[in-house]
UniProtKB/Swiss-Prot annotation:
Residues 1-6, 86-97, 148-150, 197-256, 305-317, 387-392, 458-473 are cytoplasmic. GO terms for molecular function: dolichyl pyrophosphate Glc2Man9GlcNAc2 alpha-1,2-glucosyltransferase activity. It is an enzyme of class 2 (transferase). It holds the Pfam family DIE2_ALG10. Belongs to the ALG10 glucosyltransferase family. InterPro entries: Alg10. This is Dol-P-Glc:Glc(2)Man(9)GlcNAc(2)-PP-Dol alpha-1,2-glucosyltransferase. The gene is Alg10b. PANTHER family: ALPHA-1,2-GLUCOSYLTRANSFERASE ALG10 (PTHR12989), DOL-P-GLC:GLC(2)MAN(9)GLCNAC(2)-PP-DOL ALPHA-1,2-GLUCOSYLTRANSFERASE-RELATED (PTHR12989:SF10). It comes from Mus musculus. It is a multi-pass membrane protein.
Length: 474
């Protein structure tokens, strides 16, 4: 059975890579020059490729650290020595873009290993389910598209998933080192390095919580009723747990590689004067709480085979009626957050090359009241996401929610790329869905990818004040 699964995996990976190579060829023919953010990334990588590493050679418009460029040089330079290619060829746009295609192969393999590790292997979860889940996430539209451009997404996901895998296998020093590599691609990836530490802490808290529950059971204390009472008990338990020096010492000994990484990050922020390098004018942090609601909607859209069903809607409505006071409070708080904390970035309104421009224009700008009318849908999506993660411990859920808030809420710009990593972490940790739902999900992703690539490659346009060809993209 294991050998057969290996054949299935090899076939899925080979077919995906073949299709990706064909798409890469189409991209290379259509895009001879750097496009969008590539106008910053590609020249910087080419300077590194030529051995010009001094700070005077750094483009101040770049806001991320040089992880992508350093890895690219580490890949293409040995290739030039082995193949005898000239520097002009090895540092070309096509070769540098191909580095991300290599990252996509690594991501496919890491996703498969993560599904094998995260999901319990039993008769109920077949090899087909694991491989279909891997294939589906590997072609997740928002991530898959950027495998063909010289962006940081593919490498960022690779090192973050690798760090998560090493964490699950208990190799925490390697995990922290890989977390640092992820940070070098995108500074906010430090949150997902902290997530690995949080995973360890959640495990230990769960063990202690089980002992606590067993004591309560033996003392025959009345069980708590309702989620708020349960949450209050959990928070009280965490407070008591954190007050114990013995527990803190044990947690530090477990998580010290991540603690060192976080201390290095804080030192970087102090020395740099902020998390962003280069141009900070367009990357101002703020409390943009509706980003959580946008993530819930994004997740509900891309995971609709698992989150949307008539049964789920009926269950949700029944729960709303049963706990109408609590849901009324949640609704009022959500409306308040939408009212007071909605921010509209200048790029969202000005750049009509991104899909988010049209989502905002045709949904949110249709009428002032629309953003409030969507609140019930946000609440349903949030509940459906939480319900799909109920197999995980409450401590894991708390830790994931904290990391989700930290990675999305400070972002002023509505950008689907910011949702890639939290979505993948979420999708990895829900129970393996039935094959029929996975096939439906894969089919929908394939359609979305086809439409996205077709529009990007064929439906070009020009701005009135520019002769450059513009394209629609995520």
């Amino acid at each position: 059975m294991a050998q057969l699964e290996g054949y299935y995996f090899s076939a899925a990976l080979s077919c995906t890579f073949l299709v990706s190579c064909l798409l890469f060829s189409a991209f290379s023919r259509a895009l001879r020059e750097p496009y969008m953010d590539e106008i910053f990334h590609l020249p910087q990588a080419q300077r590194y490729c030529e051995g010009r590493f001094s700070l005077s050679q750094w483009d101040p418009m770049i806001t991320t650290l040089p992880g992508l460029y350093l890895v690219s040089v580490g890949v293409v330079k040995p290739a030039s020595w082995l193949l005898g290619w000239s520097e002009h060829v090895i540092c070309s746009i096509g070769v540098l873009r191909f580095v991300n295609l290599l990252f996509s192969v690594g991501n496919f393999y890491l996703l498969y290993l993560l599904f094998r590790k995260v999901q319990p292997r039993n008769k109920a979860s077949s090899s087909i389910q694991r491989i279909l889940s891997t294939l589906t996430l590997a072609v997740f539209p928002t991530l898959y598209f950027f495998n063909f451009l010289y962006y940081t997404e593919a490498g960022s996901v690779f090192f973050t998933l690798f760090a998560y895998l090493m964490c699950l296998y208990g190799n925490h020093r390697t995990s922290a080192l890989l977390g640092f590599c992820g940070f070098m691609f995108r500074q906010t990836n430090i949150i997902w390095a902290a997530f690995c530490a949080g995973h360890l802490i959640a495990q230990k808290c769960s063990e202690a919580w089980k002992i606590e529950l067993q004591k309560k059971k033996e003392e025959r204390l009345a069980p708590t009723k309702g989620p708020l009472s349960e949450l209050r008990r959990v928070l009280q338990f965490l407070l008591v747990y954190a007050m114990s020096l013995k527990n803190l010492r044990m947690l530090f000994l477990l998580t010290w590689p991540y603690v060192l990484l976080l201390l290095a990050f804080f030192a970087f922020v102090v020395v740099n004067g902020g998390i962003v390098v280069g141009d900070r004018s367009s990357h101002e942090a703020c409390l943009h709480f509706p980003q959580l609601f946008y993530f819930f909607s994004f997740t509900a859209f891309f995971s609709f085979p698992h989150l949307l069903s008539l049964t789920k809607v009926k269950t949700f409505l029944s729960l709303v009626w049963k706990r109408r006071v609590q849901f009324s409070v949640v609704t009022l708080v959500s409306i308040l957050l939408v009212w007071k904390f909605t921010y509209v970035h200048k790029y969202l309104l000005a750049d009509n090359r991104h899909y988010t421009f049209y989502v905002w224009k045709r949904v949110f700008q249709r009428h002032e009241v629309v953003k409030y009318l969507l609140v019930p849908a946000y609440i349903f999506a949030g509940w459906a996401i939480a319900d799909s993660l109920k197999a995980k411990s409450i401590f894991w859920n708390l830790m994931f929610f904290v990391c989700l808030v930290a990675s999305t809420v400070p972002q002023k710009l509505l950008e689907f790329r910011y949702f890639i990593l939290p979505y993948i972490i979420y999708r990895l940790n829900i129970p393996l869905p039935p094959i029929s739902r996975l096939v439906c999900e894969l089919g929908c992703y394939t359609v979305v990818n086809f439409v996205t690539f077709y529009i990007f490659l064929n439906k070009t346009f020009q701005w009135p004040n520019s002769q450059d060809i513009q394209r629609f993209m995520w």
